[in-house]
């Protein structure tokens, strides 16, 4: 709860900022999208948001000046390869000792990110100040935010003349009520806001009905080009990919594998990913307690996940929710059929049940295990769905999705609040 004094200070600061913005607006240049900056929490890590943002940056860099601004630097080099023409800069380098003032600020919690945002623990007063200063130095171009904490700061502090685009990589209904309330108050300030799925687009249209952004569109992620051949679907390997977090549901996948291993002891489950050491230890303990130590393998992170997918025959998704499901498309791009829980919202918008994979509507692990066993038992079905998966993935190539971003950016240069072309809105 804010004290009366703090509320007065905050209102005064925002009032002063509004005055500065009005003055700057008088000198603001015409809308210009030749420069694009993408804000990421940590561009040096691994994960779907990072991979897809880097993929988008590489496409836009063919015709634009593109910079990825990472709020934190957590490694010497990014986990994913940075495409030609893309610069990566950072605001808080956590690989080297900080100065005394930076240490003091870094020990203070963020004042701009709601505690309910999952990035709250990573951001702090130092990242707040450095991000605000970086934004206020901008004079033109486009800035793309990629998560609520960043988006909320962007809507407050982006100066006139800078076009703002918000992106969400998780579902609206997965956010805490307090975070949803902040989104409703602030996201209407965006020049454009993009969701990944049609279902989430509907949620945001409803949530932002009172204060909508100028453009509200759906643009799915594009599947990146991955090393590795199309799978032969002959290896007795089921694969799962993701960080070790409750949302990914690997506890449910291990439980599902009990029934699969009993019926098909010659098949193995390989889980690629990483997370907090205590989460990995809990997952490993679950595997051991289930008697699956030889059947379920924790493989760690792989920078060449396409090669690993090409050596698998089924991709399993046990998530409790998926903002999109980038790894589903990555598996499909290798001709691997997908068996997934029908969780909100991504899987059902990518997978066509019985065509390129199976959607399990029950949330019970046994149902997921039964669906995996069905694809193991029926080789003809596996091959048919694998071939269809390749065709599904082709609709998400960058040469298909990239032009939708180009159309949105072109629309941002158009005066007025007109909606983008239907092809962009999806």
Which residues does each PLM region occupy?
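A short, well-ordered alpha-helix in the C-terminal region of glycosyltransferases
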Residues: 367, 374, 381-395, 404-407
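Aromatic "clamp/platform" in nucleotide-sugar-dependent glycosyltransferases that forms part
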Residues: 301, 320
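Conserved acidic donor-binding segment of nucleotide-sugar-dependent glycosyltransferases
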Residues: 352-354, 358-365, 373-379, 394
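A conserved mid-protein helix/loop that constitutes part of the nucleotide-sugar donor-binding site
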Residues: 48-55, 236, 240-262, 269-271, ...
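Nucleotide-activated donor-binding/catalytic signature segment of Leloir-type glycosyltransferases, i.e.
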Residues: 281-300
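N-terminal strand-loop element at the rim of the active site
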Residues: 15, 24-33, 39-46, 63-121, ...
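A short, active-site helix/loop in glycosyltransferases that binds the activated sugar's phosphate group
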Residues: 153-154, 189-215
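Short hydrophobic beta-strand element within catalytic cores of glycosyltransferases
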Residues: 337-341
